[in-house]
Amino acid sequence: MTSTYAVLSEGLEKRFGEVRALRGLDLAVAEGTVCGVLGPNGAGKTTAVRLLTTLLRPDAGSARVAGHDLVREAAAVRGRIGVTGQDTSIDGDLTGRQNLQLFGRLHRVRGPAGRTAELLDRFGLTEAADRPASTYSGGMRRRLDLAASLIRRPDVLFLDEPTTGLDPASRNLVWDVVRGLTAEGTTVLLTTQYLEEADRLADDIALVDRGRVAHTGSPAQLKALVGAHAEVIVPDADVLTEAAAVLDRLTGGQPSFDRERNAVAVVSKDPTLTLPLLVRALDTAGVPLLDASLRPPTLDDVFLRLTENTDTVKERAA
């Protein structure tokens, strides 16, 4: 492993009975970046996080995290990472301040009181710091849990769906914290259900499907693999079929109809499609137009196009 990568895995495999959760996971996360790990339910995202944080042992393959071998140097890996999972590790009988100070003592943090005060302020928890955590809302507990994972300033932070269930204000606060971490040199590996979250935070995305990394790249690079969403509205339902034929021929996509609006839409398989090209093609074919639009692809479109578990992805994206 070179100093370029904070996380590097090659051929990671994990089986649970007859289920192959990971089938050769190759992942490279550059230092000081946010890597978003996306994929449909059951793709292997959480299993990958559990392996890379030493909570599970791989059946095959190798990995290095923060410069240490995942298996041979598991204790050293644990000393360099922070983890926030889908379930919080907060003690409800302790106050928020006491929880963070406890984590500070467990990790032998110098000056835990000062670091605790800093994190309480950073996560907007100062006013509630001396209340029992059992009185906190779900969003406050999630923020406190994330603060606990940062108590020792980890080199690599693993966030497994950290904003699930948070209100928009709390989610934005967490996003600001994540951006600040990378500015300080921390590497973040993030799994999330929220495609907007990955789009806004991730420098690179690893799209996991059926236990493997199917595609990698920046959000912009992945979107470039998927064409834009084109829609045409015509004045008469009688020409919908003609409009659909033009879209089919031009884009290679499968047209869908909204007959109440006399509209036909398609996700283009051609990333070079432009609105002027679309309008000219319809005009050449003699198809009258009321309106035509071309929307840039989103990560939702990337999900639907680039993963094999299409039905699951549609359910997740809904």
Question: How would you label these PLM feature ranges?
Answer:
Residues 271-318:
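C-terminal coupling/interaction segments
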Residues 14, 27, 232-234, 266, ...:
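Preference for bulky hydrophobic residues occupying beta-strand positions
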Residues 4-9, 14-209, 214-215:
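ABC transporter nucleotide-binding domains
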Residues 175-269:
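ABC transporter nucleotide-binding domain
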Residues 1-13, 309-318:
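ABC-family P-loop ATPase nucleotide-binding domain
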Residues 10, 233, 258, 293-295:
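Solvent-exposed beta-strand sheet faces enriched in polar/charged residues
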Residues 82, 99, 108, 145, ...:
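A generic structural signal for secondary-structure junctions
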